[in-house]
C-alpha cells in the first residue's frame, strides 16, 4: 500500500469537506497526485487565501474581502428592499435569477432550537436595526421552506410587524416545469391559497 | 451576492476535484468558510505537502515519500509474488483484504489505445524487468475487469508468457453476499467456467 503520512493526512483533510466520505476522499487525493498536481497546489493556495481574507460584510453579513461587500456598495441597488436569506449560497441563487435588485441581509444560519441556535446566534438584533434604519420599506423573507426556515421567518415577522414595514415572503407554489400530478399536496394547497 | 475574487477562485479550484460540480464546490466553499476554517487551512497544508513530497516508489511505482515504499522494504513480504494493479487505490483495496502478502507493481494507468495510452506510457518495460529479476515466481494480474483492464492484462501476459513465470489472474465470479437471480449473465458464466 502507498505510504501513510502525507497521503493519509490529505485523505483525512479531504474528508472534512461536506458530502465526502473516505472513498471519495481517496479518489480525490489519487486524482490530484496522479493527474493534477498544479490543481492540488492551486486549491491549496485558494483555501489559504480564502480562509485568511474572507470575512463578513458589516452591513449584510455575507462573505466579502472588504469591509462592505460590492452588493451593499452598488448605488444601482434599490435600498428600500431588504431580502433576508439564510446563507450566501441562497443569496447567490437569488442573484442568479436576475429578478431582484434590492439589498440583502444574510443571517448566516437559521433558528434551530434543537441545536441550541436562538435569535442571538444568528444576529437578529443586527437585522432589526438594519430594517429600521429608515431607508428600508419592504423586508422580503427568503429563508428556506423548511421547519427551521419557516420558524426563522415567523420570528422575524413577529419582531418587525409593529415597525410599519411591508413584510413579504417568497411565494410557495408549483415549481416551473412540473406537472400537478407529481407535485406534493402541501405545495398544491399553498399554490391554491396564494393564487393570483 | 458575496464578493467574487478569493471565494470564486476557491470554488473554481474545488471544481478540479473529480466528481465535484459547481453546486458541490459552492457548498464546500461556504461550509469551510462558515463552519470549518481550521479544516480549510488543514486541507491547504495537506495538499501543499502531498503535492511537494509524494513521488513514485523506485520498485513498485506506488506513491511514497521515500525512494522506496514501506511495502517494498517490508522483509515479511513474500517477494516471489508480484501483484500488478492499475492504481494505488486498487492496491489499497487489495491490502485492506489482508489476504495478500506479496509485493506489488502499480502501473499508474492502463492501456487505452483510444486515449493514445500505449505500453510505453504505463511503464510495461519496468514491469517486465522487475518480473524477470529472478526473485519473482508468480505474477498476479489484478487489473480491473473492464475492457482496458482486460486488454492491459492480456498484453502483460503475452509479454511474460515465455519467461517461465507463473501467470495468474484474479478470479471472476459471483460477488460475496449476492443472489444469482440478480447477478449479470457474463459473471455467472465466468463463475461456472472457473468453478473449483
UniProtKB/Swiss-Prot annotation, chains A, B:
Which Gene3D superfamilies does the record associate with it?
3.40.1360.10, 6.10.250.240, RecR Domain 1 (1.10.8.420)
**Disulphide connectivity of cysteines:** none
Q: Which InterPro entries match?
A: DNA_Rcmb_RecR, Rcmb_RecR, Rcmb_RecR_Znf, TOPRIM_dom, TOPRIM_RecR
Which SMART domains does UniProt cross-reference here?
TOPRIM
GO MF entries: DNA binding; zinc ion binding
Q: Where are the zinc fingers (C4-type)?
A: 57-72
Name the UniProt key words of this record, in alphabetical order. Answer: DNA damage, DNA recombination, DNA repair, Metal-binding, Zinc, Zinc-finger
Annotated GO biological processes are: DNA recombination; DNA repair
Q: Pfam families from the xrefs? A: RecR_C (PF21175), RecR_HhH (PF21176), RecR_ZnF (PF02132), Toprim_4 (PF13662)
The record, for CDD domains, names: TOPRIM_recR
Query: Which N-terminal stretch is annotated as signal sequence?
Result: none
Q: Which PROSITE patterns match?
A: TOPRIM
Superkingdom assignment: Bacteria
What residue stretches are annotated with the Toprim domain?
A: 80-175
Q: What does this protein do?
A: May play a role in DNA repair. It seems to be involved in an RecBC-independent recombinational process of DNA repair. It may act with RecF and RecO.
The UniProt entry, under NCBIfam families, shows:
recR
The Swiss-Prot or TrEMBL record describes its family as follows:
Belongs to the RecR family.
Please identify the protein, giving its name as recorded: Recombination protein RecR
Species of provenance: Albidiferax ferrireducens (strain ATCC BAA-621 / DSM 15236 / T118)
Amino acid at each position: 500500500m502507498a505510504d501513510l503520512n502525507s497521503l493519509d493526512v490529505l485523505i483525512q483533510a479531504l474528508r472534512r469537506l461536506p458530502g465526502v466520505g473516505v472513498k471519495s476522499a481517496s479518489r480525490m487525493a489519487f486524482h490530484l497526485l496522479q493527474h493534477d498536481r498544479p490543481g492540488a497546489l492551486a486549491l491549496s493556495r485558494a483555501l489559504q487565501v480564502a480562509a485568511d481574507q474572507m470575512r463578513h460584510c458589516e452591513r449584510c453579513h455575507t462573505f466579502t474581502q472588504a469591509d462592505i461587500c460590492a452588493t451593499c456598495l452598488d448605488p444601482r441597488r434599490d435600498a428600500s428592499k431588504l431580502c433576508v436569506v439564510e446563507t450566501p449560497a441562497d443569496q447567490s441563487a437569488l442573484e442568479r435569477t436576475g429578478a431582484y435588485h434590492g439589498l440583502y441581509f444574510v443571517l448566516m444560519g437559521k433558528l434551530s432550537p434543537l441545536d441550541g441556535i436562538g435569535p442571538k446566534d444568528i444576529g437578529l438584533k443586527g437585522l432589526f436595526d438594519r430594517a429600521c434604519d429608515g431607508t428600508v420599506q419592504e423586508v422580503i423573507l427568503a429563508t428556506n421552506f423548511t421547519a427551521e426556515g419557516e420558524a426563522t421567518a415567523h420570528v422575524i415577522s413577529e419582531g418587525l410587524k409593529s415597525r410599519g414595514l411591508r413584510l413579504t415572503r417568497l411565494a410557495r407554489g408549483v415549481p416551473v416545469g412540473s406537472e400537478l400530478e407529481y407535485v406534493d399536496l402541501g405545495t398544491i394547497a399553498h399554490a391554491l391559497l396564494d393564487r393570483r
